[in-house]
């Protein structure tokens, strides 16, 4: 049975989800019946077709009034501010993928359900009272039919959690720190402008900018055993896509670089195939643009100090990889039944 979805919010993630659906060949399984976005229909179609990070969309895109056509598929375009007014019941929507970045509470999810959707998947961590927070490949098998309001966590959580799991299962993590080296985002100005975070008043293209991150909370939401044992910081850098994560963990078992890389490489081809990738090529961030994996381990950067302190570097396309996981989680939610 085809899963009928609606996308609420057609920004970076919303558009990536739609493109990934068509480019990954999953169109036969999932149908987009509607997109809700306050921007103009013309602007929505234009930014779907032409993208500064991901290039031109290979499918034919047309827009007529409030209808978007992708190939032979027609998608209804909505411009509704209030969730409760969205026609999810009329459109027989199975799952709403809320990619707005604005909504993420249980109350927001219940508003989608009241409008007629059967389930809701948020594209960011959301509040802690949701039915489930999923990092696909790690805990998606714990989804149940009663989980109606779900979070897909964050792009950085999806990147680092599989690697943490692999290292913990093999070597026993005591504690760790994470530094996210993240591409600039749309909450940063092109030139200096006012923002409540004074660092984010500064031009995105001119500085490396420290910003707040909730990644440590994201880690402990998935792995509560690490409460008070992981800390994270984040900096934004002047690139428009792809993120690197510097992970340092102390482990109980004595270990060397070859053992770590062998584990991560084997897992990329077996238990985490399609989720984690591994490379020892001399690559840079641009080479991981449009990569569908949640995480790509750079084996050339693995280090060990004193046999118990591990440092790894993990790449991800923070848009494209996450968009593909949104689709994976959508399928997993549907497989549990409605």
From Swiss-Prot:
One of its GO terms (biological process) is pyridoxine biosynthetic process. Pfam families: Gp_dh_C, Gp_dh_N. Substrate binds at residues 154-156, 200, 213-214, 236. PROSITE patterns: GAPDH. Its main location: cytoplasm. It is found in: Cytoplasm. Keywords: Cytoplasm, NAD, Oxidoreductase, Pyridoxine biosynthesis. The active site is at 155 (nucleophile). NAD(+) binds at residues 12-13, 318. InterPro entries: E4P_DH_bac (IPR006422), GlycerAld/Erythrose_P_DH (IPR020831), GlycerAld_3-P_DH_AS (IPR020830), GlycerAld_3-P_DH_cat (IPR020829), GlycerAld_3-P_DH_NAD(P)-bd (IPR020828), NAD(P)-bd_dom_sf (IPR036291). Its EC number is 1.2.1.72. One of its GO terms (cellular component) is cytoplasm. It catalyses: D-erythrose 4-phosphate + NAD(+) + H2O = 4-phospho-D-erythronate + NADH + 2 H(+). GO terms for molecular function: erythrose-4-phosphate dehydrogenase activity; NAD binding. Belongs to the glyceraldehyde-3-phosphate dehydrogenase family. Epd subfamily. Homotetramer. This is D-erythrose-4-phosphate dehydrogenase.
């Amino acid at each position: 049975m085809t899963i009928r979805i609606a996308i609420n919010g057609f920004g970076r993630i919303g558009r990536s989800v739609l493109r990934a659906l068509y480019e990954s060949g999953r169109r036969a399984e999932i149908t987009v019946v509607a997109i809700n976005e306050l921007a103009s229909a013309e602007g929505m179609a234009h930014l779907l077709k032409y993208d500064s990070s991901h290039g031109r969309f290979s499918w034919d895109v047309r827009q007529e009034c409030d209808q978007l056509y992708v190939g032979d598929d027609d998608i209804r375009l909505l411009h509704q501010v209030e969730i409760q007014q969205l026609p999810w019941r009329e459109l027989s929507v199975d799952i709403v993928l809320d990619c707005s970045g604005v909504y993420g509470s249980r109350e927001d999810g219940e508003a989608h359900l009241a409008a007629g959707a059967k389930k809701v998947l948020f594209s960011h961590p959301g509040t802690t009272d949701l039915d489930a927070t999923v990092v696909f490949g790690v805990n998606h098998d714990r989804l149940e039919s009663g989980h109606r309001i779900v979070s897909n966590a964050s792009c950085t959580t999806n990147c680092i959690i599989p690697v943490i799991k692999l290292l913990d299962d093999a070597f026993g993590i005591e504690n760790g720190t994470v530094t996210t080296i993240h591409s600039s985002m749309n909450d940063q100005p092109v030139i200096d402008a006012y923002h409540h975070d004074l660092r984010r008043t500064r031009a995105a293209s001119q500085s490396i900018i420290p910003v707040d991150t909730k990644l440590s909370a994201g880690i402990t939401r998935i792995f509560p055993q690490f409460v008070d044992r992981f800390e994270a910081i984040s900096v934004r850098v002047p690139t428009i896509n792809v993120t690197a994560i510097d992970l340092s963990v102390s482990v109980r078992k004595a270990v060397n670089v070859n053992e770590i890389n062998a584990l991560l490489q084997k897992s990329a081809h077996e238990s985490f195939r399609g989720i984690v990738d591994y490379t020892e090529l001399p690559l840079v961030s641009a080479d991981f643009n449009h990569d569908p994996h949640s995480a790509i381990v750079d084996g050339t950067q693995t280090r060990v100090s004193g046999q118990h302190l591990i440092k790894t570097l993990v790449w991800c396309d923070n848009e494209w990889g996450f968009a593909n996981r949104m689709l994976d989680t959508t399928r997993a939610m549907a497989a549990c039944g409605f």
